[in-house]
């Protein structure tokens, strides 16, 4: 689901999937600020890269003697975030660790993402 916020100058859309900015448009000119996500080239627009940026050596990491598989740019960009606050000028999202995330990142976490003016 895409959620929207705006003020006098900007119109913004954010996806619950990955808490990713999908659109930033200037209201005065109609100019689009973000890449349009053309899947022929790159379907993302502004992904949140967590818990790692890029790839790890052989797509693995070792923590406390145990090996874990990693994913390029982490997993947050593919997870559904919970929108915990939604207003006309503010969105606040939360992603919490779960059984699936612990397969790749063996720590409990809460990742907060906030958009607003």
Explain the meaning of each model-derived region.
Residues 1-117:
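Surface-exposed acidic/polar loop and edge beta-strand patches at domain peripheries
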């Amino acid at each position: 689901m895409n959620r929207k916020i705006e003020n006098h100058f900007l119109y913004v859309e954010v996806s619950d999937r990955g808490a990713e900015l999908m659109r930033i448009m200037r209201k005065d000119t109609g100019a689009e600020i973000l890449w349009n996500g053309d899947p022929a080239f790159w379907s993302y627009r502004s992904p949140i890269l967590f818990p790692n940026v890029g790839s790890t050596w052989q797509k693995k990491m070792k923590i406390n003697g145990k090996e874990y598989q990693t994913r390029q740019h982490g997993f947050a960009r593919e997870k559904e975030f919970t929108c915990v606050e939604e207003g006309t000028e503010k969105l606040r999202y939360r992603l919490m660790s779960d059984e699936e995330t612990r397969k790749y990142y063996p720590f409990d976490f809460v990742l907060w993402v906030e958009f607003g003016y």
